[in-house]
């Protein structure tokens, strides 16, 4: 329940990403009184970062060493690449944590400003969608890590039951110091590698969930602007007149000035968010085609049914990640361009020349759709189709060499 002074959106604001962010010590927060981050957040971050770095370095190294065996190499490269990208995501958020906290506060101010029931209902709907998508990502990632962790245990139990030779393997193909796989230390190593996978899941569910939530909140902010524009002309009751009076034009200009201020604040926030996410989105998309391609090849080449099930979970999580970035970016661009459509449908032709200039200024800026653009591409649903097509082409090419 929210306090009586809080809007309805407060209960849903970054609900799922906040949980993941707190677990890895990266949720943008400050100590009351303007201080730095809590000490326990630093400890959690150091542990999570160390676990993910060890997994990324060890698994990628294992894949490079075993390039002569494609199946074994791909089994190491798939989770290793994901962890390597997560190392980057964790570092970007840690390095600029104060700036991320400022962005959260700015977005909160934008969404908290409108307390109308209609506006809050719309924002809660978008926030619910964002949280459900974030939960889907967290669930698919957790299922993938559980599959990697349980597969060696199940196979080891089966060998013990039927009295086959062999020992329990580690959950990931990874290069470790020799002492880490000694019988006395092996259980601890297994637990730490499981923790490495869990930290990876919480890391990307936080960062990617933060992105999709931010994008849908920006979409909601642009829709608030659209509602404000409709209300300006609806409150005038100008259906009975052919031309607005001077008083009506003055009222329109006064209220449009407030709309312009909010619109500019949203665009500035979107620009700053894009600047912060540029490296993260770029590296995620550059690695996406490789991850999808290698995962599908793993499923095709692997003869173990358990391994196949594990990589089916993996590809679901990878596709969910990619979809969230494209879905969020697509919503931002469409909602920003919709402001111009709403404004054009209003009775602007009844305004005087001075008021029309204000309307034209908003119209021209809105026609340039705001996007979460990074070098070489913009996250959108067409970009998702392009990446899936590229991954399919890579698979077709590699199959000719197998």
Swiss-Prot record:
Transmembrane intervals: 43-63, 74-94, 135-155, 174-194, 202-222, 277-297, 308-328
Localization annotation: Cell membrane
Extracellular side: 64-73, 156-173, 223-276, 329-402
Membrane topology term: Multi-pass membrane protein
Keyword Membrane found: yes
Main location (coarse class): membrane
Pfam (any one): 7tm_6
GO molecular function (one): ionotropic olfactory receptor activity
Recorded family membership: Belongs to the insect chemoreceptor superfamily. Heteromeric odorant receptor channel (TC 1.A.69) family. Or1a subfamily.
Other observations noted: The atypical heteromeric and topological design of the odorant receptors appears to be an insect-specific solution for odor recognition, making the OR/Orco complex an attractive target for the development of highly selective insect repellents to disrupt olfactory-mediated host-seeking behaviors of insect disease vectors. Odor-evoked OR currents are independent of known G-protein-coupled second messenger pathways.
UniProt name for this protein: Odorant receptor 22c
Organism in which the protein naturally occurs: Drosophila melanogaster
Gene expressing this chain: Or22c
């Amino acid at each position: 329940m929210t306090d009586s002074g809080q809007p309805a959106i407060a209960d849903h604001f970054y609900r799922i990403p906040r949980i993941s962010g707190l677990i890895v010590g990266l949720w943008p927060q400050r100590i009351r009184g303007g201080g730095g981050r809590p000490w326990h957040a630093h400890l959690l971050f150091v542990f999570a970062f160390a676990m993910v770095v060890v997994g990324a370095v060890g698994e990628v190294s294992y894949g490079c060493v075993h390039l002569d065996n494609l199946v074994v190499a791909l089994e190491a490269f798939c989770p290793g690449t994901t962890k390597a990208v997560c190392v980057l995501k964790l570092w970007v958020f840690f390095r600029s944590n104060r700036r991320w906290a400022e962005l959260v506060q700015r977005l909160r101010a934008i969404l908290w400003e409108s307390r109308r029931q209609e506006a809050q209902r719309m924002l809660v709907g978008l926030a619910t969608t964002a949280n459900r998508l974030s939960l889907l990502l967290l669930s698919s990632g957790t299922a993938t890590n559980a599959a990697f962790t349980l597969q060696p245990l199940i196979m080891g139990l089966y060998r013990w039951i039927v009295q086959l030779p062999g020992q329990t393997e580690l959950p990931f193909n990874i290069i470790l110091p020799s002492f880490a796989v000694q019988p006395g230390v092996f259980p601890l190593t297994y637990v730490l590698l499981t923790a490495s996978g869990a930290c990876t899941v919480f890391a990307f569910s936080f960062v990617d969930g933060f992105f999709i939530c931010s994008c849908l909140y920006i979409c909601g902010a642009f829709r608030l602007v659209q509602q404000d524009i409709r209300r300006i002309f609806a409150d005038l009751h100008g259906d009975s007149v052919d031309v607005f009076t001077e008083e009506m034009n003055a009222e329109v200009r006064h209220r449009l000035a407030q709309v312009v201020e909010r619109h500019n604040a949203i665009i500035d926030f979107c620009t700053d968010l894009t600047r912060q996410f540029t490296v993260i989105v770029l590296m995620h998309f550059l690695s996406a085609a490789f991850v999808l391609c290698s995962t599908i090849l793993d499923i095709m080449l692997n003869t173990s049914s358990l391994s196949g099930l594990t990589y089916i979970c993996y590809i679901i999580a990878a596709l969910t990640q990619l979809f969230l970035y494209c879905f969020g970016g697509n919503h931002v661009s469409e909602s920003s361009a919709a402001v111009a459509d709403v404004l054009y449908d209003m009775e602007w032709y009844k305004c005087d020349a001075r008021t029309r200039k204000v309307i034209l200024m908003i119209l021209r800026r809105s026609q340039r759709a705001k996007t979460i653009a990074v070098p070489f591409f913009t996250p959108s649903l067409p970009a998702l189709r392009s990446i899936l097509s590229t991954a399919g082409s890579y698979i077709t090419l590699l199959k000719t060499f197998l």
